Amino acid sequence: MTDSSYDAQAVRSWLQGLQTQIADTLGAFDGTPFATDAWQRAPGEKLRGGGYTRILEGGNFFERAGIGFSDVAGDALPASASAARPQLAGRGFEAMGVSLVLHPHNPHCPTVHMNVRLLIATKAGEEPVFWFGGGMDLTPFYGYEEDAQHFHRTCRDALQPYGADLYPSFKRWCDEYFFLRHRNEPRGIGGIFFDDFSAPGFDQSFAMLRSVGDAFLKAYLPIIEKRRNIPYGQAERDFQAYRRGRYVEFNLVFDRGTLFGLQSGGRTESILMSMPPVVNWRYNWQPEPGTPEARLYSDFLVPREWV
């Protein structure tokens, strides 16, 4: 985080285009256009700035799909952003990014999350400090080996031009990050996750971020195209709702993006659009041995090298 030369407008323009491209593509896939909710922080609020929330609820394929763009600034980095770098505590900041979570109706189609972001810390009389973060991860309810392999292969290929070491490092980071410590289990089958990324300089770091964001549809669309017409019943929906409970637990207890948004006075509706619309908890529930539900735990919710 030593290179202070950056082009925030270039990042902003790309993020806005990425949000539009993904929303248009997924809206066409569903047959339902995304609604757009433009928002702006009022004068005197803790944060300045605004964004666009693209939301689809009760669609033909997606039960809930949210794609948010935000560009906000504040006077002091919240604890969730500065804990790992105490020297930046109290600095002003600008944070911009696109974050999405997609919840299909069909339990055979996985939930997916993707985020790409830029954060700039500022202090009067000192050079600004920037870094990129992001990634994508897949949360299946019924596991398919070829889907997990395709998702990870696409992530690896997006990172390959920027260093052969990035995918193994970001994959391991993702496995460690999306882990429910109180359950001793991962949230899903992972993907890639990175933060504090700026060492190659702005141009190369931004190019890597673009490669990740632009790979999202390649990673996810072939999976849902293949699984969308698999029949399912109430038992599968019940298991999906039960596993979605883990998603809620992670997002509200551990997720740095959620905590950053809430701690910084972010827009609650946009922050919590990642929540699944139907979810349940059961006391000490265990899957029947030999079932597809049991196989999710034994074969997919374990550390694996998918590619």
Curated annotation (Swiss-Prot):
<dbReference type="GO" id="GO:0004109">
    <property type="term" value="F:coproporphyrinogen oxidase activity"/>
</dbReference>
<dbReference type="InterPro" id="IPR036406">
    <property type="entry name" value="Coprogen_oxidase_aer_sf"/>
</dbReference>
<feature type="binding site">
    <location>
        <position position="113"/>
    </location>
    <ligand>
        <name>a divalent metal cation</name>
    </ligand>
</feature>
<dbReference type="GO" id="GO:0046872">
    <property type="term" value="F:metal ion binding"/>
</dbReference>
<dbReference type="InterPro" id="IPR018375">
    <property type="entry name" value="Coprogen_oxidase_CS"/>
</dbReference>
<feature type="active site" description="Proton donor">
    <location>
        <position position="113"/>
    </location>
</feature>
<dbReference type="GO" id="GO:0006782">
    <property type="term" value="P:protoporphyrinogen IX biosynthetic process"/>
</dbReference>
<comment type="subunit">
    <text>Homodimer.</text>
</comment>
<comment type="pathway">
    <text>Porphyrin-containing compound metabolism; protoporphyrin-IX biosynthesis; protoporphyrinogen-IX from coproporphyrinogen-III (O2 route): step 1/1.</text>
</comment>
<dbReference type="Pfam" id="PF01218">
    <property type="entry name" value="Coprogen_oxidas"/>
</dbReference>
<keyword id="KW-0479">Metal-binding</keyword>
<comment type="function">
    <text>Involved in the heme biosynthesis. Catalyzes the aerobic oxidative decarboxylation of propionate groups of rings A and B of coproporphyrinogen-III to yield the vinyl groups in protoporphyrinogen-IX.</text>
</comment>
<feature type="binding site">
    <location>
        <position position="182"/>
    </location>
    <ligand>
        <name>a divalent metal cation</name>
    </ligand>
</feature>
<feature type="binding site">
    <location>
        <position position="99"/>
    </location>
    <ligand>
        <name>substrate</name>
    </ligand>
</feature>
<feature type="binding site">
    <location>
        <begin position="115"/>
        <end position="117"/>
    </location>
    <ligand>
        <name>substrate</name>
    </ligand>
</feature>
<feature type="binding site">
    <location>
        <position position="152"/>
    </location>
    <ligand>
        <name>a divalent metal cation</name>
    </ligand>
</feature>
<feature type="region of interest" description="Important for dimerization">
    <location>
        <begin position="247"/>
        <end position="282"/>
    </location>
</feature>
<dbReference type="GO" id="GO:0042803">
    <property type="term" value="F:protein homodimerization activity"/>
</dbReference>
<keyword id="KW-0560">Oxidoreductase</keyword>
<feature type="site" description="Important for dimerization">
    <location>
        <position position="182"/>
    </location>
</feature>
<comment type="similarity">
    <text>Belongs to the aerobic coproporphyrinogen-III oxidase family.</text>
</comment>
<keyword id="KW-0627">Porphyrin biosynthesis</keyword>
<keyword id="KW-0963">Cytoplasm</keyword>
<protein>
    <recommendedName>
        <fullName>Oxygen-dependent coproporphyrinogen-III oxidase</fullName>
        <ecNumber>1.3.3.3</ecNumber>
    </recommendedName>
</protein>
<dbReference type="GO" id="GO:0005737">
    <property type="term" value="C:cytoplasm"/>
</dbReference>
<feature type="binding site">
    <location>
        <position position="103"/>
    </location>
    <ligand>
        <name>a divalent metal cation</name>
    </ligand>
</feature>
<keyword id="KW-0350">Heme biosynthesis</keyword>
<feature type="binding site">
    <location>
        <begin position="265"/>
        <end position="267"/>
    </location>
    <ligand>
        <name>substrate</name>
    </ligand>
</feature>
<dbReference type="InterPro" id="IPR001260">
    <property type="entry name" value="Coprogen_oxidase_aer"/>
</dbReference>
